[in-house]
Amino acid sequence: MAISAVGYYTVGLKADGTVVAVGDNTDGQCEVSDWRDIVAISAGYGHTVGLKADGTVVAVGDYNYDQCEVFDWRDILAVSAGSLHTVGLKFDGTVVAVGDNSYDQCNVADWRNVVAISAGYWHTVGLKADGTVVAVGYNEFGQCDVSGWTNIK
């Protein structure tokens, strides 16, 4: 994604692989001026995540729940920042997650054959290669009730 916004700040990915950010910087989530070789970005509640061309990940901002502890991630294809957690899709179709796990939103270690991910406020959703969807996390409003979904692109 070339732009990402949440809460009170906005992040943009430039064509040259650098990143710009404006807005609330209370947690340092806009401190992206030194990022290079970025191919994707995602803004979380108080943190920003960037995917580098080499499959590694960078993050800045709120560390209170370890949602920025992505520095050892490798072979990442996509990233998504949630409220207080961060999710990464690996090239092999598995998923990694760090951060607040109060509602099991980071319990993605057993996911396989995933082709897309999205981190919600307190939940995480994954699209599988066969068009089905998996979800974990807070489900008070049924936001994780996707087990019957098929043919999703």
Name each model-derived stretch.
Residues 32-34, 70-72, 108-110, 146-147:
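Surface loop/turn motifs at the tips and blade-to-blade linkers of beta-strand repeat domains
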Residues 25-26, 63-64, 101-102, 131-132, ...:
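Acidic glycine-/aspartate-rich tracts in secreted/extracellular proteins
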Residues 1-3, 13, 151-153:
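Low-complexity/repetitive intrinsically disordered segments
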Residues 9-12, 21, 47-50, 59, ...:
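Conserved core positions of repeat-based scaffolds
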Residues 1-2, 15-18, 36-40, 53-58, ...:
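Tandem repeat domain/solenoid detector
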Residues 136-153:
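Blade-level signature of beta-propeller repeat domains, shared across WD40, Kelch, NHL, RCC1
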Residues 9, 29, 47, 65-67, ...:
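Intrinsically disordered, low-complexity repeat/linker tracts enriched for polar/charged residues
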Residues 6-7, 37, 44-45, 75, ...:
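Beta-rich catalytic cores
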